[in-house]
Amino acid sequence: MSDTMPEIVSPLVAENSQEQEESVLISLDIEEDKLFLLHFIIGTYFGPDLRKQHHRPKQSAFQIQALKNVVVDELSGSLMKRAELERVYYHIIRNVDPSLVMKPKKLREYFNAKRNDSNRDYPLFVDLFPRKLHPETHVRHKFKFIRSIVFINDPDTSCMREECVARFKRLTGLDSFALSLSVDVTKSNGVVAANEVKVEIDESVEPVKEDNAGTCTSGEESDVAAKPEVKSEAHGGLMVGLMDIGECDDAYLFRVSLPGVKRDERYFSCEVEDNGKVLVRGVTTTGGKRVKRYSHVFEMQTRSLCPPGNFSVSFRLPGPVHPHEFSGNFGTDGILEGVVMKNLQKQTV
């Protein structure tokens, strides 16, 4: 962290002989629990993406702070969507007390704000990942990428003071730091082509009539289109695409029911456009004629689940949004939940 933040991160140097390397522990002196959780998660589960020939890979931001300063030549130049960082944050705090969850506006301030005297006591993203080393890249004015950041799904917390680790576990209820998550990283030479980023959306897909919203057909690909107020008229079986939309002063929240949909990010995508259109695409794995389990082959009888194959769900939020301020989580309960910030300037024009 920068020299202007001694009261938030305090390196504690253990007494060693001159021949031994100094042992440094990081202490987070952040009084507010939700700020502590946010900064701890970002600094522990993410780190500079270093070239392998310079350092062993996947050291967290806190580990790097405890060891040395990083220079640009040591960084890989890879790119990660900022929404991926937010997704990891929301995944970790999914079961915490609601009072510990950072509101979207404050979360955006954490990532966007620059260090100055007015926020001296407030932890910021730039304290862990300085802009000169980890600049943001915009693609099509919709996606925010951060350069040279890597996700660590099983971080080493030995550089943190024990009370910090204990506080994190107490607030989250987690006993282990290991996560079963994967995060997309784009390798880059310093230039990102738009067609390398937005490959999931096929503009040729046309929505079906709203009377069929919430149903899954037996064709190669089904598409569900709905206005926020539309409800499904379908009956029977588990349906892909049932949804709910919420609104607050500065953001929209949507939830989409996706039972039987493969959660592997290689097959699943969710994209938000600036006009509020949301397009979800993926693959269903249920509804087959035969199911193999434990060397047995079962012939399915009722077959009321969605048939296996590709699908897409599209709908429109009530107003324009900032697509690069979108974070989502596809949980094991089969519910896709997303939060996206409103574009208030366009709404007032």
Swiss-Prot record:
Question: Keywords on this record?
Answer: Nucleus, Stress response, Transcription, Transcription regulation
Keyword Nucleus among UniProt keywords? yes
* Gene3D superfamilies named among the record's database cross-references: 2.60.40.790
Q: In which tissues is it expressed?
A: Expressed in cotyledons and hypocotyls in young seedlings.
**Expression triggers:** Not regulated by heat.
Query: Domain of life here?
Result: Eukaryota
For region Disordered, the annotated ranges are 210-230
Classify the main location. nucleus
One GO cellular component, as annotated: nucleus
Q: Where in the cell is it found?
A: Nucleus, Nucleoplasm
Asked if the Swiss-Prot or TrEMBL record annotates the protein with the keyword Transcription regulation, the reply is: yes
Impact reported for residue 49 to E: Loss of function
Q: Which residues form the sHSP domain?
A: 233-349
Phenotype on deletion? No visible growth or developmental defects under normal growth conditions. DNA hypermethylation.
Q: How does it assemble?
A: Homodimer or oligomer. May form an 16-mer complex. Interacts with MBD7 (via C-terminus). Interacts with IDM1 (via N-terminus). Interacts with IMD3. Part of a complex made of MBD7, IDM1, IDM2, IDM3 and ROS1.
What function is annotated for this protein?
Answer: Prevents DNA hypermethylation and transcriptional silencing of transgenes and of some endogenous genes. May act as a molecular chaperone of IDM1, regulating its H3K18 acetylation activity.
Family indicated by similarity: Belongs to the small heat shock protein (HSP20) family.
User: What is the official name of this protein in its record?
Assistant: Increased DNA methylation 2
UniProt organism field? Arabidopsis thaliana
